[in-house]
């Protein structure tokens, strides 16, 4: 089924398509139960539904949501918001550009783990504040890229990769299954020459998180080896149907 409406989105261009076509098919076939935390207008939730997922959308702002699918109003700063959504119900938890908005990122991650059913997988994205452009900006101006006064006002929690993997995930009882950067080898900038300079500098410096404007993170529960695994039969571009 194709959506008659396509709600707008402020997410990085192409990120939703990347998740649907290149990432999710490595772990799932469509048809499982999924929840979109921080659904916004409903753009990603609609695409998940149209691809065959059984989707629930959740967000604090009811007024922005325009997709005709089930929606629950939730405050992600609540200590146990998972209790309102159904602990252990979801094979897939998606949260695109949300964790940087919450007051307690470890608490947010714990709630994500509670929502996962055994073998379930969570997919998060967040601005890459470890990138070369971010490091250059902090060196020159002392401000964090995509977190400064010119950025989204509700960006309050920068996610630094070393701290995230070394402290946040163990405390939330989650384990890292996969880490991607988007765009994979570059940056989305208004000045192409500047993006080229940043790529050149990144190649000289070396390091895992120097490229890309966004972290794309796949997580599973670390409790009793309950994490999901990539599905070798579901690799390649996702077309809305599956051979699984």
Give names to the regions the model predicted:
Residues 1-88, 92-96, 106-109, 124-126, ...:
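Conserved N-terminal segment of class I S-adenosyl-L-methionine
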Residues 97-101:
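A short His-aromatic
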Residues 103-107, 134:
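Short N-terminal helix/helix-N-cap motif within the alpha/beta-hydrolase-1
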Residues 107-121:
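A short glycine-rich, Lys/Arg-flanked "PGG" loop and its adjoining helix->strand segment in the class I
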Residues 124-146:
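Conserved class I S-adenosyl-L-methionine
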Residues 140-150, 194-199:
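Short glycine/proline- and charge-enriched loop/turn segments
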